[in-house]
Amino acid sequence: MQTTSIKTASGMYINYFFLGMVNIILASNMSSLTKQWNTDPTGISYVIAAIGFGKLLTYGISGVLSDKIGRKPLVVASAGIMAVFLVGIPLSPSYELAFVFALLAGVANSAMDAGTYPALTELFPSASGSANVLVKAFMSVGAALLPLLITFLADHSMFYGFAFYLPAAVYLLNIIYLSTLSFPKKHKKPTNSGQQESPVFLSEPVFQKEGTALIIIGFTSTALFTVSQIWLPSYAQKAAGLAESASVQLLSYYSIGSLASVLLLAVLLNRWVKPVFITLLYPIITLCTLAVMLTVHIPVVLDITAFFLGFSTAGVFQITITLMTELFWKRKGTVTGIVATASSLASILLPIATGLIAKAGGIAHIFIFDFGIAVIGTAAAAFLYYRYKKLTGAQA
């Protein structure tokens, strides 16, 4: 059984390894895409927003389908749809067609989330927090490797589209692999996030309280890493005068920080630290990091802050879903879809809002705006932490 669970999880983790690339692939190829579609960086940010719009349109139905027909069909379908996006973008002759492919990427992402997170919770009920956080680990590795692949293609004067075609090919192969695997049955009651005991609540969790706080955290956690992934290189160019090639490397430092964080969480969540504490600690770290980044514009400091931004935004969304499925376990797929809908709203609104701010000539103001989002996330996490302690009667 354990071997079967690991094989099934590995197929889902492969999906997320390449989703890590997908999340930054448009921003990382901004120069090539602006020329191909005759647009500007703000236009690319709107295509990125279309991915979030695709997620928003389908997260609700994806969550319901996950509970109705099972996790496997959604996970398999997501890989196929994502491959279509990756092949379609470099071949798109127009901005409008690219927008359609971006919508498909959002559909794929929603299906992937609604199928994968509940499945991991059911595969590893005594370590669901660690299993879900490892999703972010694989995404971070993929995101860290993509800039290296793009640099390799540029150095060898190769078509930028190969950075899209390689993950597309692996997604297609993964469909075959996933189709041979067994997925868990639905509606098993989970154990406490990353703990060995079943959750024992002193009172029934209230969706209007704990659920609302988790939805807010789902929004802010996605907003924080969305802003960094799109605008961190541009901010470094404007604030510290870094060259374009050097500024893109900040995304690698960001991804390394993310990877370090989730590997640490994968160990700590199963032994010493409860997920609810991380949802409070990490936004506080983000606040401190943004404060330094906004006031100190030395290149080496930006490298360090990029690392800590990646570190403090990594895994929070995954932990949020783990907590939501723990507190409201009877509808794991549905509540996953609700949190993911909040996340998709952030994926839509943040590229649009920050694109407008950038167009007004204030990239520094983007990260001041980001600081405000971190404040909201911290407040929601503090409320959740307080409520969780009351529900469990334990030191969270």
UniProtKB/Swiss-Prot annotation:
Keywords: Cell membrane, Membrane, Transmembrane, Transmembrane helix, Transport. Belongs to the major facilitator superfamily. It comes from Bacillus subtilis (strain 168). It is found in: Cell membrane. It is a multi-pass membrane protein. The gene is yfkL. PROSITE patterns: MFS, SUGAR_TRANSPORT_1. One of its GO terms (molecular function) is transmembrane transporter activity. Pfam families: MFS_1. InterPro entries: MFS, MFS_dom, MFS_trans_sf, MFS_Transporter, Sugar_transporter_CS. The chain crosses the membrane at residues 8-28, 44-64, 73-93, 97-117, 133-153, 158-178, 213-233, 250-270, 276-296, 304-324, 338-358, 363-383. Gene3D superfamilies: MFS general substrate transporter like domains. This is Uncharacterized MFS-type transporter YfkL. It comes from the Bacteria. One of its GO terms (cellular component) is plasma membrane. CDD domains: MFS_YdiM_like.
